[in-house]
C-alpha cells in the first residue's frame, strides 16, 4: 500500500513539475516561444537583454486582480471554505507578535481594523503601499496640496489624515526625497548686478601683491563672473560693437588679468583659470572683427583699383578710374574718443599702431596665464584652459601680422 502511495506521489510531483513554466520571464511577458536554453535563451541573446528563469511560477495566464467592488467584502456566492480561510487570516493578523504591532503603531487605526478598506475601497494587504503612494504623489504635486511649503499650516494626506496627528509619527521618514513647490516666487539676488551697458568696475583699492591679496574673499572670482556676464549680454555675436567699446573691454580684461595674476588664491583656483580662458577667447574674437573687416575692405579695394589702397582714408570727390558710378568701400566700424566720433582722416593716423600695441600687451598677459595653467598637466580643467589660451595666443600673433600689412 505504501508503494502505491509513493508512486502516486511521485506521479503527482512529476505532473506538477510539467505544469511549471519553463520559459524565461522575458519570453513569458512577450508571449513568445522560448528556446529554454540556459543560462540565456536564443531570443534574449539576440536582443542582448538579461534572461531570468523563475521555475516556481506556474504556466498560464496570471490570475485577474479583483475589482474594487469585490474588495469591499465577500460575495454572496462564496463557498464556506473561502469564508473560513478569510477568518483564519484575520485571526492570524490579530495574533501577530508584539514587534509587528509596535511597527504598526504609527499607522492609522483604520488600517488595522479593516475600516480603511471599507472607507477607501483599497485592499490593505495588497495595495496599501502602491495605490496610496501613487495618490500621495498625485496630491503632493498639485498646487493645492497640503504637502508644499506655504500652502497650509496643517498639511494632510490624500486620505484626509493630518500629518501633524500623533498617529503618524514620521510621515516623511519613508520618502528619501523632498517635493519642492515650483510655483513659489524666487527670491531676488542679494548681490548687485551692474547694468548690461556698463562695464563691471574693479575695486580701486585692490593690490596686485600676493601678500596683500592672499585672501581676497573671492572678489577676483566675482569680477571674472561679472565680466563674463557683461560680455555675454552686451556684446553678442550677432551685433558687432564699435572699436572703442572693444578696446575698452580689452583694457578691462588686461587689468583683470593683472589682478588675478597677483592673487595666489585665485590663481590656484581651477574655475578662475577656466573663466579667464573663456573671457580671453571672447576678447580675441572681438579684436578679430576689427581686423577682419579692415582686411576685407582692403582686399575689395585692391580688386577694384588693381593696386594697394588704404580703405581708412576718406573717399575723394572724383571716383577713381574704372569705378564710375560706384561707391568706394570704406571702413564702417566707428571709432569714438569720449563722445566724439572720429572721421576717416583721423582714424588712419593712429589706429594701426594703437591696435598693434594693444595686441602685444594682451598677448603678454595671456602668455603669463598660460604658463600658470601648464603647472598642472594632469588636471583636466587646467589642460582645457591651457589649450584655449594657446589657441588665443596663436590667434593674436596672426592678427598682429594682418594688422602690420595695413597701409
From Swiss-Prot:
Residues 23-53 bind DNA. One of its GO terms (cellular component) is nucleus. Transcriptional regulator involved in the positive regulation of the expression of the gene cluster that mediates the biosynthesis of asperlin, a polyketide showing anti-inflammatory, antitumor and antibiotic activities. The keyword Chloroplast does not apply. Residues 53-85 are annotated as: Disordered. One of its GO terms (molecular function) is DNA-binding transcription factor activity, RNA polymerase II-specific. It comes from the Eukaryota. Keywords: DNA-binding, Metal-binding, Nucleus, Transcription, Transcription regulation, Zinc. The gene is alnR. This is Transcriptional regulator alnR. CDD domains: GAL4. The keyword Nucleus applies. It holds the Pfam family Zn_clus.
Amino acid at each position: 500500500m505504501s508503494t502505491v502511495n509513493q508512486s502516486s506521489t511521485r506521479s503527482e510531483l512529476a505532473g506538477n513539475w510539467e505544469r511549471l513554466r519553463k520559459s524565461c520571464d522575458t519570453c513569458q511577458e512577450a508571449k513568445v516561444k522560448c528556446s529554454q536554453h540556459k543560462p540565456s535563451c536564443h531570443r534574449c541573446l539576440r536582443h542582448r537583454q538579461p534572461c531570468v528563469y523563475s521555475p516556481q511560477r506556474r504556466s498560464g495566464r496570471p490570475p485577474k486582480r479583483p475589482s474594487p467592488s469585490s474588495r469591499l467584502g465577500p460575495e454572496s456566492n462564496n463557498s464556506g471554505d473561502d469564508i473560513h480561510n478569510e477568518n483564519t487570516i484575520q485571526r492570524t493578523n490579530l495574533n501577530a507578535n508584539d514587534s509587528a504591532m509596535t511597527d504598526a503603531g504609527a499607522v492609522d487605526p483604520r488600517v488595522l481594523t479593516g475600516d480603511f478598506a471599507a472607507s477607501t475601497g483599497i485592499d490593505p494587504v495588497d495595495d496599501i503601499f502602491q495605490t496610496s503612494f501613487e495618490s500621495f504623489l498625485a496630491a503632493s504635486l498639485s498646487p493645492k496640496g497640503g504637502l508644499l511649503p506655504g500652502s497650509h499650516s496643517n498639511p494632510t494626506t490624500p486620505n484626509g489624515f493630518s500629518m501633524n496627528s500623533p498617529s503618524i509619527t514620521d510621515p516623511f521618514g519613508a520618502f528619501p526625497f523632498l517635493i519642492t513647490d515650483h510655483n513659489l516666487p524666487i527670491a531676488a539676488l542679494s548681490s548687485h548686478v551692474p547694468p548690461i551697458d556698463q562695464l563691471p568696475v574693479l575695486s580701486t583699492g585692490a593690490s596686485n601683491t600676493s601678500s596683500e591679496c592672499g585672501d581676497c574673499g573671492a572678489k577676483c572670482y566675482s569680477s571674472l563672473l561679472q565680466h563674463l556676464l557683461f560680455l555675454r549680454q552686451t556684446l553678442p555675436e550677432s551685433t558687432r560693437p564699435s572699436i572703442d567699446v572693444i578696446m575698452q573691454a580689452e583694457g578691462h580684461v588686461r587689468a583683470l588679468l593683472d589682478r588675478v595674476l597677483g592673487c595666489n588664491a585665485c590663481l590656484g583656483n581651477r574655475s578662475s583659470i577656466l573663466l579667464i580662458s573663456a573671457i580671453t577667447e571672447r576678447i580675441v574674437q572681438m579684436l578679430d572683427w576689427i581686423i577682419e573687416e579692415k582686411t576685407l575692405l582692403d582686399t575689395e579695394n585692391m580688386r577694384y583699383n588693381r593696386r594697394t589702397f588704404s580703405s581708412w582714408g576718406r573717399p575723394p570727390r572724383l571716383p577713381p578710374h574704372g569705378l564710375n558710378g560706384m561707391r568706394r568701400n570704406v571702413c564702417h566700424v566707428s571709432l569714438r574718443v569720449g563722445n566724439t566720433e572720429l572721421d576717416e582722416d583721423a582714424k588712419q593716423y593712429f589706429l594701426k599702431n594703437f591696435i598693434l600695441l594693444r595686441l602685444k600687451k594682451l598677448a603678454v598677459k595671456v602668455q603669463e596665464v598660460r604658463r600658470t595653467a601648464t603647472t598642472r598637466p594632469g588636471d583636466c580643467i587646467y589642460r582645457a584652459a591651457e589649450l584655449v589660451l594657446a589657441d588665443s595666443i596663436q590667434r593674436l600673433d596672426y592678427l598682429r601680422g594682418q594688422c602690420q600689412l595695413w597701409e
